[in-house]
């Protein structure tokens, strides 16, 4: 299965768009939800979680375009790769001329479950305005033998210990906000 998706939204003044994105199971995923912040005080958020197993490439991320003043955006991307799977983050944050006092935060974290899996990060930031706040952070970590040893010494089997580590890594998804009514 090839999962090639285009998702776009525009936000006018005071509006908020929240993408919650999950990617699992397809051989190839290429998905980058986009938010165009066209009105003052609009906000875009993306929370993306991807799991890449054997023979899979999950290429996910987000695009935020700040086209008005006082806009804000947040991208949180979590990926897990195992069995030789490949997880990639590909994102764009663009602040156009005139979008002063805009702010953006990008955080992408990857967890490699074994030594044959791979993670890549391709961030792109294009700022054309002086008075903005921009932050980008990326981490790639590996499940350590110490983590597994600790949990196994507490009576867990290896599969159960690994599952607990992965669940802890993606715990941000369980604390995502509920829809506002």
Where do the PLM segments sit?
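Conserved beta-strand/loop scaffold segments within soluble protein domains that form the structured core
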Residues: 1-156, 170-172, 180-181
């Amino acid at each position: 299965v090839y999962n090639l998706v285009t998702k776009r939204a525009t936000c006018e003044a005071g509006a908020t768009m929240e993408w919650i994105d999950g990617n699992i199971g397809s051989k190839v995923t290429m998905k980058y939800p986009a938010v165009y912040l066209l009105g003052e005080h609009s906000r875009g958020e993306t929370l993306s979680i991807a799991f890449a197993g054997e023979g899979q490439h999950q290429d996910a991320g987000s695009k935020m375009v700040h086209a008005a003043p006082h806009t804000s955006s947040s991208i949180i991307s979590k990926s897990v790769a195992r069995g030789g799977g490949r997880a990639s983050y590909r994102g764009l944050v663009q602040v156009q001329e005139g979008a002063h006092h805009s702010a953006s935060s990008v955080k992408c974290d990857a967890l490699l479950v074994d030594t044959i899996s791979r993670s890549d990060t391709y961030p792109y930031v294009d700022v054309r305005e002086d008075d903005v706040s921009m932050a980008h952070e990326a981490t790639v970590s590996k499940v350590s033998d110490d983590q597994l040893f600790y949990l196994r010494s507490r009576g867990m089997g290896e599969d159960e210990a690994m599952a607990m580590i992965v669940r802890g890594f993606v715990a941000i998804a369980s604390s995502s906000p509920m829809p506002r009514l």
